[in-house]
Structures are given as structure tokens and as C-alpha cells.
């Protein structure tokens, strides 16, 4: 069949509503119209009936086997009469509704009257190529209605775009290829997500183990402090007890001594009472009277009042400590209120309403500077190929030269990254950086980012808790959750980074002499303190944290160059 990409509404290529009379294998032309059939015609009719029964039997067999179209089986010629010598069909005629081998197809190729018939690849079952409404072969495709039609359907589809079946197949095959590619892409993304999730499960176990270790250590210190406080209190009470007992024993000894002295005085008085000499009596009694001590020591030890005060201090301190311990549970319950857990199983802090602000977004550099925040690079997180200078305000990728940094759990092992020492939480912040070289990334991430992993979710462009902006030497690209968004923004050496934590906004601005140009804005879901994050992926990349007192330079012909 000749190619026909588009067919105008109207009659379709020649096709009859009913199949024409079968062809004679000998003559190669249709039988003449007459009242009686020739022997050849009778033979053809008999053959057609026989072949029709065979086709029905084959179709029923195919249907029983769950293959109604007979796909996957060899299609035989309907005109080969000997069942043992039937030849494989090479074409099917949609007009005749018959399959032909190479020999029996020749009449369709040489007879001009048969050349208008619609030929296709061999099909086992012709019923599905037959219009159920008009009993005519399906010979075209209606694009708006997305269905195959016959010649008689043309009136019903008047005004529609109609193409040949071959053209429709080519179009649908192209669409199928696009669908396959899209499905393969989605499958790859899904497999990558599964891979990242499996890798993250290990990170979850490590993170939880680290938190457990910290909790055990902290509670161990707390228990040790409680035991020490208990020992100190008991020692204090024992010392007070010994002091009070010692004081009581001293008073007792003194009183016993006074009792003995008073017993002597009593005996002396009895002796003087027996003196008959008046002068002697008066002299001795007056002498005794002058030496008599009539004072008595206090027999009350005021320890009970002191103990009451000590008991009050211990009780109040204990109640306060218990309240502090109960705050552990309350704070954990607040964290667990988060409905969605991040892939790192992070917990969400509830931002207090007092931190929300209704102030408008800043638009000029002067307005941004109201939220100026001074940050520095954290040397405990810097990769061993990153050199920190200028009081930790400049970082340079010195690959392959390593720096003698101590091996710490917080240090990045694979990705050339470094975080800020300062966290960003609950408020608005603004800082500026200068970038040098293609392959630099500036962004935010959470503290729980994996420091030792080699997977993409360990870098600030490959997970759903980091947001970053990349300069690739030609343009900027925004990264989130391993998905990139090319940006149409001019090159800028100095970038302004604005964070509105309560509003969930992270914006990057190109900072020039007299203008602030928005490069990209992220809508974020901040649920814990975040940190400024930097990735220097190539050798000699450099990033410098700008002193906000420095005025931006006037634009130069090449803004983002190599590191000075």
C-alpha cells in the first residue's frame, strides 16, 4: 500500500463493504458475473468454505489457548489447498480478508484491478481488522477519536484528521518509544531512590547509635552527678551530726563537772551551818558567797532549725531536678509531633509563634543587611583536601594536597565539603560569599548529613534536606533532592544568601555594585537548625565569606574567574 500520511475527509482508498468473489488461482482475476459457476469457481467456493471452516477451527484453538489474534504462530496461506503443503503467508488482503503466500499474492501485484486492495503483514484473525458496524475492512485511523475506521465510517468522522494505518502506526510507534524512554527514566529514578533508601538505612542505624551513645554518656554523667550530690549531702549531714553531738557531749561534761562542784559546795554549807563561832561563821560564809558561780550553760543545741533549712534545700533542689528530667520527655514529645519524617528520620522542632514575623521581604542590599550574620567555616568538618585561610573565612580545594586535619566524626571523608560553624535557626539571616571557579556549590543542609558516605545523598545536591546553587562556568543551576534546575541568570562573583527560617525561604542573589538580582528562590520546609554548606568539586575552586562592610565592586568583564 502506498504511504499516506494524511487523508482528507471523504472517500477512502478503494475498499468494498463485502469481500469480492474469491480469485481463481489459475486465472489471477476475479470470476466473471454469471448465473452459473464454472468448475473452477465451484472448486474455489468449495475451497473457500473449507478454508473458512479451517480458519474458524484455528481461531477457536487460538482463543482456547488465550491467543485470540494468533500472535506468535505461523500464518499460512489460505489458498494452498493441500494441508500438508500449505506455505507461509507473506501478506494479508484487508479487502479480500484472505492470507496469501508469495505465489498466490502475484495476482494482487500484476492485476491492476487488485492493486487497490489493502495489503498488510499476515494476520491470523481478520475479525479484529473488520469494522463491526459496517462489516468493512478497517483501512484508516481517526486521530481525534483515536480509533481505526473503515470507508463507511468516513461520514461519521467528517472534519476529523484521518491518516493511513501505516502512518498511524509510525506515529504510535514513535509515541511508544517516547513512553518506553520515559518509563525507563522513571524506573531508573525509582531504582536510584531504592538504592539511596537502602544506603540511608545504614545511615539511620549509625545516626541512632550515635544519639544512643550520647544519651548514655549524658545520663551516665547525670547519674554520677546525682550520686556525687547525694554523697556530698550525706557527708554534710554526718559532719553536722558529729558537730552537734560533740557540742552536746561538751555541755554534758561541763554540767557533770558543775554537779560535782555543787555537791562539794553543799557539803561546805552543811559544815558552815555547824560552826558555833559567830565571827568564824560570818567570815567563812561571806568568803564562800563571793566565790560562788551561779551561771548555768545553755543545754539547747539548735540543730533542728538548721536541719529544717537543709531539708528544704534538698527537697526544692530534688523537685527542680525532677522537673528538668521530665522536660526530656516533654521535649521529645514535641519533636515527635512532626507528621512527616525526613529520610534521615529527623524530628521536627515546633517553631514558637513569637518567632514568626510579618515583615515584608527585603529587596535592597541595605534592607538585607538588617539581617546580616557573620559566619565562618568549621575546620572540624572540612575535607582533608580543603585549605582554610583568613581566620576560617576562605576555603580552597588543593587536590591532591592533603592537610593534616585530625580524624573526626564530623569531618567529610569523600565529598570536598565544609559547613559553617554557626547554625541558622528560627530567625532571618543574610550573608555574602565570593565564588571562584566552575564547580562551586553554595547552600544549606542539616547537621545530620552523612559525613563518611560516598553516595549522592551525602553531598549537598543529592538529598531532600539540602538546598544548593551551583556555578558550572556558564550558568547557575539549582539542586534539590538530586534534581537540577538550570537557571537563566548572568554570572555573578558575589552571591547574597538570604534565609527566612520561619517563612521557609532560601534565596540567592547576585550582588553587584548597585543592584541585587534574584538568581533562585527555594521554598523549604525547615524543621531543625540548618548550616551553611559549601562544596568545592574541582581543583583550585575557592569560596570566600565576605565581610559585609565591603562594598560590592563594579561589574568586570569576567565576573566569575579563577581563585586569586
From Swiss-Prot:
Annotated region (Disordered), positions in chain: 1-69
Compartmental location: Cytoplasm
Modified residues (Phosphoserine): 116, 203
GO terms, biological process: positive regulation of DNA-templated transcription; positive regulation of interleukin-1 beta production; positive regulation of keratinocyte differentiation; positive regulation of retinoic acid receptor signaling pathway; response to growth hormone; response to retinoic acid
Zinc finger intervals, B box-type: 72-122, 126-165
Catalytic activity: S-ubiquitinyl-[E2 ubiquitin-conjugating enzyme]-L-cysteine + [acceptor protein]-L-lysine = [E2 ubiquitin-conjugating enzyme]-L-cysteine + N(6)-ubiquitinyl-[acceptor protein]-L-lysine
EC number: 2.3.2.27
Main subcellular location: cytoplasm
Cellular-component GO terms for this entry: cytoplasm; cytosol; plasma membrane; PML body
Subunit relationships: Homodimerizes via its coiled-coil domain. Heterodimerizes with MID1, TRIM24 and PML. Interacts with Galectin-3/LGALS3 in a ULK1-dependent manner; this interaction mediates autophagy of damage endomembranes. Interacts with BECN1. Interacts with ATG16L1. Interacts with p62/SQSTM and LC3B/MAP1LC3B.
Name of the protein: Tripartite motif-containing protein 16
Gene label: TRIM16
Amino acid at each position: 500500500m502506498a504511504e499516506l500520511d494524511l487523508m482528507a475527509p471523504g472517500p477512502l482508498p478503494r475498499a468494498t463493504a463485502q469481500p469480492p468473489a474469491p480469485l481463481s488461482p489459475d486465472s489471477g482475476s476475479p470470476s466473471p458475473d454469471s448465473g452459473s459457476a464454472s468448475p473452477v469457481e465451484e472448486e474455489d467456493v468449495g475451497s473457500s468454505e473449507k478454508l473458512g471452516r479451517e480458519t474458524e477451527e484455528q481461531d477457536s484453538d487460538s482463543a482456547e489457548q488465550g491467543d485470540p489474534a494468533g500472535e506468535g504462530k505461523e500464518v499460512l496461506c489460505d489458498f494452498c489447498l493441500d494441508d500438508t503443503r500449505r506455505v507461509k503467508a507473506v501478506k494479508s488482503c484487508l479487502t479480500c480478508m484472505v492470507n496469501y503466500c508469495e505465489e498466490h499474492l502475484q495476482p494482487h501485484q500484476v492485476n491492476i484491478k487488485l492493486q487497490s486492495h489493502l495489503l498488510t503483514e499476515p494476520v491470523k484473525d481478520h475479525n479484529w481488522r473488520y469494522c463491526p458496524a459496517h462489516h468493512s475492512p478497517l483501512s484508516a485511523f481517526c486521530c481525534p477519536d483515536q480509533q481505526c475506521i473503515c470507508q463507511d465510517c468516513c461520514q461519521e468522522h467528517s472534519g476529523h484528521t484521518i491518516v493511513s494505518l501505516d502512518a498511524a502506526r509510525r506515529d504510535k510507534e514513535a509515541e511508544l518509544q517516547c513512553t518506553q524512554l520515559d518509563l525507563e527514566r522513571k524506573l531508573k529514578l525509582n531504582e536510584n531512590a531504592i538504592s539511596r533508601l537502602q544506603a540511608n538505612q545504614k545511615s539511620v542505624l549509625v545516626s541512632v547509635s550515635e544519639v544512643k551513645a550520647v544519651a548514655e554518656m549524658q545520663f551516665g554523667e547525670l547519674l554520677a552527678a546525682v550520686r556525687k550530690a547525694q554523697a556530698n549531702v550525706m557527708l554534710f549531714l554526718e559532719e553536722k551530726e558529729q558537730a552537734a553531738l560533740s557540742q552536746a557531749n561538751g555541755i554534758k561534761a561541763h554540767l557533770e563537772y558543775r554537779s560535782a562542784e555543787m555537791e562539794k559546795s553543799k557539803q561546805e554549807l552543811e559544815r558552815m551551818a555547824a560552826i558555833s563561832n559567830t565571827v568564824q561563821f560570818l567570815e567563812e560564809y561571806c568568803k564562800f558567797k563571793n566565790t560562788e558561780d551561779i551561771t548555768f550553760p545553755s543545754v539547747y543545741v539548735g540543730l533542728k532549725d538548721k536541719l529544717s533549712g537543709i531539708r528544704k534545700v534538698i527537697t526544692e533542689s530534688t523537685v527542680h531536678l525532677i522537673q528538668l528530667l521530665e522536660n526530656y520527655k516533654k521535649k521529645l514529645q514535641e519533636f515527635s509531633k512532626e507528621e512527616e519524617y525526613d529520610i534521615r528520620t529527623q524530628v521536627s522542632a515546633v517553631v514558637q509563634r513569637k518567632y514568626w514575623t510579618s515583615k515584608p521581604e527585603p529587596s535592597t542590599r541595605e534592607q538585607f543587611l538588617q539581617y546580616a550574620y557573620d559566619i565562618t567555616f568549621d575546620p572540624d568538618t572540612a575535607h582533608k583536601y580543603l585549605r582554610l585561610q583568613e581566620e576560617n573565612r576562605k576555603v580552597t580545594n588543593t587536590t591532591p594536597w592533603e592537610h593534616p586535619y585530625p580524624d573526626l566524626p564530623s569531618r567529610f571523608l569523600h565529598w570536598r565539603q565544609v559547613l559553617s560553624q554557626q547554625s541558622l535557626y528560627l530567625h532571618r539571616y543574610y550573608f555574602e560569599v565570593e565564588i571562584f571557579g566552575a564547580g562551586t556549590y553554595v547552600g544549606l543542609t542539616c547537621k545530620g548529613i552523612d559525613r563518611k558516605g560516598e553516595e549522592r545523598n551525602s553531598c549537598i545536591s543529592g538529598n531532600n534536606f539540602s538546598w544548593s546553587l551551583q556555578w558550572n562556568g556558564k550558568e547557575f543551576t539549582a539542586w534539590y533532592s538530586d534534581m537540577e534546575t538550570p537557571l537563566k541568570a548572568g554570572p555573578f562573583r558575589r552571591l547574597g544568601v538570604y534565609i527566612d527560617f520561619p517563612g521557609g525561604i532560601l534565596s540567592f542573589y547576585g550582588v553587584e555594585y548597585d543592584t541585587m538580582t534574584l538568581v533562585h528562590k527555594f521554598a523549604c520546609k525547615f524543621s531543625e537548625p540548618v548550616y551553611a554548606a559549601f562544596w568545592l568539586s574541582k581543583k583550585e575552586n575557592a569560596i570566600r565569606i565576605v565581610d559585609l562592610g565591603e562594598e560590592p565592586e563594579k561589574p568586570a568583564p569576567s565576573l566569575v574567574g579563577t581563585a586569586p
